[in-house]
C-alpha cells in the first residue's frame, strides 16, 4: 500500500462509520460485519499497518470506499449526501478533540475497560455497544459542535440504535484521528481529488 492508500484506508473507516450511522437512522438495520469492523478499530493499539486496525483486510470498508468515491467524483447519482455530511462533521470533531487533553485522557482510560468487555462478550455485543455509546456521550457529545443525525424517529428513539449510532461516531472519529496521523488534511479532499481517486479505485478492485 502507498502512503496515500494508507490514508484512504483510514478515511474509508470514517466514511464507513458515516454510512452505517445513516443506515441505522433510516432503516434501523446495520450489518454485524460493519459494526464489528468499526468497534474493533477502537481497541487496536500499536498496529503494524493501517489495515490491521480494521481486522487485517479492507473488505468491510468497501461501503465506506464507495461513499468516499461518490464524494470525490461529485456525481449527483452516486453522492451519498447524509454520509458525506456525517463524515465531514467527524473530521471537524476530531480537530476539536485534538485540543482537549482531558478528553483524550478519559477516552484512553475507558477503552481498556471496553476491551475487557469485548474479550468477554465479543465486539458487537450490546454491552460493548452501550459502553462505546456512553463513552461518546460523556466526551465528544459535550463539545460545542454536535452531529445532528437525520432519519426515522422510530429508529432514532430506540436506545439500542442510539447507542450504535454514538458508538459508530466514536469509531469514525478514531479513524479521523488515524487519518490525520497518517498525514491526511481536509484540503486534500478538494485540491487532490483526482490523485485520491486514482489511488482509491484499485482498493475497490482488490476483491
Swiss-Prot record:
Domain of life where this protein originates: Bacteria
HAMAP family, A to Z: HflD_protein
InterPro entries: HflD (IPR007451), HflD-like_sf (IPR035932)
Family per record: Belongs to the HflD family.
Pfam families linked to this entry: DUF489 (PF04356)
Keywords assigned by UniProt, alphabetized: Cell inner membrane, Cell membrane, Cytoplasm, Membrane
Cell location: Cytoplasm; Cell inner membrane
Name of the protein in its database record: High frequency lysogenization protein HflD homolog
GO cellular component, as recorded: cytoplasm; plasma membrane
UniProt xrefs under SUPFAM superfamilies: YcfC-like
Primary localization class, coarse: cytoplasm
NCBIfam families the record matches: PRK00218.1-2 (NF001246), PRK00218.1-3 (NF001247)
Membrane topology (UniProt): Peripheral membrane protein
